[in-house]
């Protein structure tokens, strides 16, 4: 026992001595360590091993507990023996080396340094928080939405987009009150109004003297679409181009300026409201157009002057400039495309079409016109303002004849027919859900450019159309129309001679009336109508060819389609009529544009179309015919001829005016019905436009109602189209798409026809 105790005591003494030494060393080491720390980096600290011993000291504490027991055992006696061993301490030094092994524990020190690093790590965590701040920047993306909001402002012109919808209801209310709350809309725009006061528009006020035309105010509803006013800014420059001194168009510039400043199409809208006064002009003009139909011969004489008229920059130039200008600034049209999304805007695109018609008067513009078609959808709003000017042209019957001459010129520039096609497509779109399609339409516009190439082929068809008019009637007997399409190319050979014939075509027009009697035959054809239903199937078959075929051949057919477009425009009106008389009016304006597309003989038709805008005038004469056209049947007859040959469409237009005047018009409707079956054939050309068919769905639903109401529509001033804007149709469009799919039992066939029609458009 003693030995162990002695040894134990010795061990304790050694530990104590070592611990004392280590404590001293530790203090020095700490001093040195701190010195190194402050002086340099961590390189020196590692060499300092003293530090580890300081840490190793903890192990000694472990032993210290045993030390306490020994004290207990330390009897005074034992202590003396212990001291002697201390003398032996020399040997103990050897143990000190063993102490070095504890330095192995140094690792604990390194661990401390790591802890230091962790703190830096912690700092990074704080930076991470700053990133959370970045997420707020992410919120900034919502701000980008602001730019869209700006577009809505155009739509909303009012403080909030919601207002724009409210505005649509107001249009509905407007119909109830011919007084036209629309004038009130200008008050809303009053902020911009200051600009307007400068505009000469007050003169338009003078034009308003005819309160009856207040229905023309309907255009104001149309103006609602002005929201796309982005394109309008483009028009402003056009207005400047129009600077053609005479034009009050300067007035238009004010509207244009307004859009630029607030970007608020609303300001433009006020002008649209004022523009309704301009619509008033259109009504007066329409009466002259009516006269024109009575005297087709007269229009031919005008043809010669027409060329001169183009020189007169005052009328056509001003109008054309706007259309041309639109092309000049296609860039805006892209922005407009968003507006196109806006259903309201699409409708107006048709209004633009009328300007294209004017463009034809001067072939030069025609190229620009193509861009306008694209732009037209973007900036349908201005087109309405332009329409009033076209209307003014109608006031001078001679002017409308100028349009006919332009048609002749158009053959020189086939491009028109292609551009027109594009517009036609747009018109249908506006009528229906198209609003959505309108964007697609815009896409087509770009493809349209490629069509321009086709237009050259188109040239031949356009020219044939003139002289062909006579031949076309024979073609009509051959309802097969399909082969006839081929014939149209032969017609193309005549094209050039046809120009001189233009005058003769008017005489031909008289025979055309007999040809209408053939339409009466079409009623007999009605028995075949069952067969026609198969013909409809053929159209599908034909369509397959068209995909490949259509590219080359279509150009000529395209011209034919232009004429078909007339009938399509009519159909759209019927469609609108069923939904509400108001709809038909809006559509009718598009028809007006479509007629412009046919520009050839159509020039006359466009005026009739204008009549629809003002139910008062048109009701007496064409409105009824128009209504009949609304009945898909009427337009179909035209389409078949167009399908057969482009010429047929041409003469058919001139004929149309007389039919309008003549009571025979009722007869048309019956014959027309068989044609509806034919319409499917016409669709064959249209297939390329198939995208629009979606729009057609809306028409199917409406079309059925149209037939019964057509008569009512003429009498009713329902044109008050103010409702039209409401129809604007976004709601209608959603509903209509489903109806077409649902396909009412009876309507489906007609709906199918409507699809092809839209395609042409």
UniProtKB/Swiss-Prot annotation:
One of its GO terms (biological process) is seed germination. Transmembrane segments: none annotated. It comes from the Eukaryota. Residues 63-735 are annotated as: 40 X 17 AA approximate tandem repeats of Y-S-P-P-[IV]-[KY]-P-P-P-x(1,2)-K-P-P-T-P-T. The gene is EPR1. GO terms for molecular function: structural constituent of cell wall. InterPro entries: Proline-rich_CW_protein. Induction: Under positive control of gibberellic acid. Keywords: Cell wall, Cell wall biogenesis/degradation, Repeat, Secreted, Signal. Specifically expressed in endosperm during seed germination, at the site of radicle protrusion. This is Proline-rich extensin-like protein EPR1. May have a specific role in modifying the cell-wall structure, specifically during seed germination, thus facilitating radicle protrusion. One of its GO terms (cellular component) is extracellular region. The keyword Transport does not apply. Residues 1-24 form the signal peptide.
